[in-house]
């Protein structure tokens, strides 16, 4: 399933009255959350929290006015995911600063409404030949975002191989 197949995304993961998937700024696919506690917009590219605002309050997380939206380009502002390294790559100057997680599509794997009315989305990074050329380690990364009275973001990396892996993230 393509992450830009909004009908399929909404059929599988939407939560009526709380969560929908739609084209966002620059045509990027986004999850739009509105629940009893807050509202948020999360780009599927980078699993990037672009906005978060407590209910009936001004935004606490927002995008830069200089933000540009294009597939494969990092979004300025919000809460970007830096993975699997932070800053410049240790040995390859041509690799992107702060890793590639900000510029690739993440897959939605789970959505749920919590007992207190918060909305939780779980994303998994989608790797391809280009990302494996930069990060050839057996691993998985998930970004778990909970929109409630507070904004909770949990980045989880799992080593799925037998060799030790060193990474940096933010």
Regions found by a protein language model. Give the residues of each.
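Acidic (Asp/Glu) carboxylate-rich active-site/surface patches
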Residues: 155
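Surface-exposed acidic/polar loop and edge beta-strand patches at domain peripheries
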Residues: 1-146, 150-152, 160-170
């Amino acid at each position: 399933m393509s992450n830009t197949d909004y009908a399929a995304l909404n059929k599988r993961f939407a939560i009526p009255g709380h969560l929908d998937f739609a084209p966002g700024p620059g045509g990027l696919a986004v999850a739009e959350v509105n629940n009893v506690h807050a509202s948020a917009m999360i780009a599927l590219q980078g699993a990037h929290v672009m906005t978060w605002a407590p209910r009936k309050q001004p935004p606490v997380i927002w995008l830069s006015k200089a933000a540009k939206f294009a597939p494969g380009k990092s979004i300025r502002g919000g809460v970007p995911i830096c993975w699997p390294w932070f800053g410049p790559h240790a040995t390859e100057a041509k690799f992107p600063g702060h890793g590639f997680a900000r510029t690739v599509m993440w897959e939605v794997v789970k959505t749920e409404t919590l007992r207190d009315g918060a909305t939780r989305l779980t994303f998994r990074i989608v790797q391809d030949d280009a990302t494996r050329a930069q990060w050839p380690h057996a691993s998985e990364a998930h970004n778990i975002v909970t929109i409630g009275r507070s904004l909770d973001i949990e980045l989880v990396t799992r080593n799925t191989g037998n060799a030790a892996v060193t990474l940096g993230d933010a």
